[in-house]
Each structure stands twice: as structure tokens, then as C-alpha cells.
Amino acid sequence: MSKRSDGSQPRTIVDKVWDAHVVRAETPDAPAILYIDLHLVHEVTSPQAFTVLRERGLKLRRPERTLATMDHSIPTLPRGADGRWPFVDAQAAAQVSQMERNCADFGVELHGLGDDAQGVVHVFGPEMGATQPGMTVVCGDSHTATHGAFGALAFGIGTSEVGHVLASQCLLQRRPRTLAVRVDGELGPGLSAKDLILAIIAKLGVGGGTGHVIEYLGPAVRALSMEGRMTLCNMSIEAGARAGLVAPDDTTFEWLAGRPRAPKGAAWDEAVARWRALPSDDGATYDRELRLDAAALEPMITFGTNPGQGIAVTGLVPDPVAERDASARATLEAALRYMGLVPGKPIAGQKVDVVFIGSCTNGRIEDMREAARVLKGRKVRTRTLVVPGSHRVKKDAEAEGIDRIVREAGAEWREPGCSMCIAMNGDNLQAGQYCVSTSNRNFEGRQGPGGRTLLASPLTAAAAAVTGAVADPRRVLEGR
């Protein structure tokens, strides 16, 4: 590694953000104490942590660095005529009321049901301008890596760690290794960030990023919008990575400017100057590197029961017989057995029962627009739920007429929430049903007991909606 002109060693963005937040250095016997800039909380993983604070007589260490919303267990149907929300069960209603009480008692800013800013936590946080370059961000949710799209070091934590951050604003963490994923070329028509990340996970495998933070680099990544970068980083955990990020640039700054929690005036100029120093230095080294050519990719879809089991929509369902490793062969056999798919058969044409467009992976305005491109002037042939990721997304989409396109196509236009991504809120599959979903996990039963999930982009999901089967969105858009 060559030194920079000032004599210092070149550093990656991960090094820079990590080093700036170490309160106590890591030793062989103890992890580092890492300061946390932003703590996002929701109604499912926070109640126990607040209970611990009460039991121990502790206050919230930094209320101004804690931000709350509701998303997992809330209904995506509107209030009834009686003014009540149609919760799926008493537990869901209790989680919401407990969240309201906890935030009131501890002075946490909450954007709950009925609030114009409420949304899925990883859509809501960036929209508020709370997520900013160079930050450390945590949340009691697996897909916190979404916020890495802004050049933040963002990762999910468990409920006990939620309590640690509430009480101390710090966490015990071991320094992660770094993995550079460089994507050359340009994505072709009909492809998006979702296709790119599914291709990356298929290449790495679901454990390929274990112990690492992924930095996404290259012209194909730079060409992505902020919505696309959030999709990319969101699924880093599905490759086993601790987090994923993209260095900030003008695209980042333009997206953040003017948002509620973003700096204003001279403070904004000072912040941007700091943020411009965050990208990895020339000559910085990574523990590992992976390279892909975006131009070689096709629209992707999963066929199995983990996000690494993905193929092009033009491809064939893999045959376990071709798998040399016995363990991998057994895993593939089990996945195909659960999914009810035939090896060697084209995935295109596979009948679909439900389509879900939404989630923290693909519930943003760009995703709504992409789905509307396919739905416009067509009719769905299967049940289709379109769920905006936040009230802001919903409002913007309705201003553009996207809700009318969705309804005229025969699809359902819902209220913001996690919805069918996690199936704990009344939106779920029945046993044996196939769903093309824009969410992030296709585990057994993820969308309901016995449900079969095929992960795809909004374009591919919408193509499945109007054809009733897995289809190449490029052909649908071309009218073929």
C-alpha cells in the first residue's frame, strides 16, 4: 500500500467512518466501543428494550438521535367507518399502543399511524434527511444496511443491543473486513438495481459476505439513483454481509438537500465539504474484491428458498444433479421440493397467484413509477398489491396519477407498511401460492405458511401481474 502525499496510508470509506466513531479501541480481548449517530426504532423490536430501561431506572441517552415510526405490524388497509385501524390481531394493536407510550415516556420523536411522515423505517429515515453520509446508523431490523446508500455505516442489531444504544448511544463491535464489489458497464433496458443485487448475491452466495462490509463501486453503481442505491445496499445482508454502502457524491447531496433533518444554510455547505472527503482514497486496499459486468446481466428472479438462488428470467430451473457438492445438492433439492419447481424447466411461464410490489427494498417512488410503466393500459391477471413505502411516496405517486393506473389495472393500492414482505400484519399468502415479490427474502413461510416467494424487480413483478406468470419485462414492455 503506497502512502498519500501527506504521508498517511490510503483508507477505504469503511475505515474513515469506523475510525471517526471509535470511543474505545478494539483489543484481542474486547470489541471496540462504537458511537452511534442515528438510532431508528419501530414497534416490533423495541418494546423489550424500553422495558429494560424502565426496570433499571435509566433515561434515554440521546433522544435527539433516536427516531421512531411504525411499519411491521400495522395494517395496509385504511381505517374503518368507525375510525379504527383494522389490526390483524390484538398483539399488533398492543405493539402500536406500546410504541406510542414508550416514545411519549422517553421523549422519542415518533411518526406513527396517521402521521404524514410515517412509513417503512428504511424508507422513512432517508426521506426525513436523518440518514446522512459518514454516520453510524443502527436499527433493530435486518435491512438497516439500506442507509449505506448515503455513505453511512449502517447495520441491524438485536433487541438487547437496541437497549444498549438507547441507554448509552454506543455499541460493542468488532471491526469488519471489507469487500469491494465493482460493477462495470451499464445496465440494459428493463434492468434495475434489484436485478443487479440479485445477480451479486447469486455470485457471492448467501454466506459470501460474512464478516464484511461491502462497498459497491464502478460506473454502473454511480449511474444509479438514490432509490436504486438503497435497493442495492438493502440486500447486502442477504449475501451475509454486515453492511453495504456506496460513497456519497452529487447524486447523494442533491437528494438530501432540503429534507427536514438535513443541515441548512452554512451548515449544509460545511457538511457537504466534509462528506466529499469520505470516498475511499486512491490506492486503498480491500480484504476481497468481486467484479461484475452490468451489460452482461438480464432481469433476475429467484427460484428457491434463499436470495442466492437466483437466475435470469430467461433461464432454466437448475438441476441438483449438476451440483457436485453433496451439501449444496441437498439444499437445492430441498428448495425445489418446497417450491414445487421442476429442474430444467424454464422459469418463465411459471404460474403466479399473487404479486407484491413494495417493501423497504422496492417501495419508493421510482419503484412505483417502474411498476406503473408496465401496468398502464393493461389489466392484471392475478391478485396484485401495490404498497407505497411511506406516506410521502403515496402522496407523490398519487400526485402523478400512479394510484389511478394501479386501480384501473385491477390491482390494489394500499396504505404504507411492510405488508406482505413479512406477513405479520394481515397481508399474507395461502399455503401453496406463488408470489412474485419485490421484497428481500424468500425463506420458507416468509410471506405466510407454505407460501412460495420469487424475488424480482418492480418491472418483473408488474410483468408477472399482467401476464399471470413469470415473464420477461422487456418483452412485455415491447408488447410481445
Swiss-Prot record:
Gene name of the record: leuC
PROSITE patterns on file: ACONITASE_1, ACONITASE_2
Cofactor(s) listed in the protein's UniProt record: [4Fe-4S] cluster
Alphabetical list of Gene3D superfamilies matching this protein: Aconitase, domain 3
UniProt keyword list: 4Fe-4S, Amino-acid biosynthesis, Branched-chain amino acid biosynthesis, Iron, Iron-sulfur, Leucine biosynthesis, Lyase, Metal-binding
GO molecular function: 3-isopropylmalate dehydratase activity; 4 iron, 4 sulfur cluster binding; metal ion binding
Pathway(s) per entry: Amino-acid biosynthesis; L-leucine biosynthesis; L-leucine from 3-methyl-2-oxobutanoate: step 2/4
Functional note: Catalyzes the isomerization between 2-isopropylmalate and 3-isopropylmalate, via the formation of 2-isopropylmaleate.
Catalytic activity: (2R,3S)-3-isopropylmalate = (2S)-2-isopropylmalate
Binding site for [4Fe-4S] cluster: 360, 418, 421
Enzyme class: lyase
InterPro entries per the UniProt record, alphabetical: 3-IsopropMal_deHydase_lsu, Acnase/IPM_dHydase_lsu_aba_1/3, Acoase/IPM_deHydtase_lsu_aba, Aconitase_4Fe-4S_BS, Aconitase_4Fe-4S_dom, IPM_dehydratase_rel_enz, IPMI_cat
Cofactor remark: Binds 1 [4Fe-4S] cluster per subunit.
Single biological process term from Gene Ontology: L-leucine biosynthetic process
Taxonomy of the source species: Bacteria, Pseudomonadati, Myxococcota, Myxococcia, Myxococcales
UniProt record similarity statement: Belongs to the aconitase/IPM isomerase family. LeuC type 1 subfamily.
Stated name of the protein: 3-isopropylmalate dehydratase large subunit
Oligomer status and interactors: Heterodimer of LeuC and LeuD.
EC number: 4.2.1.33
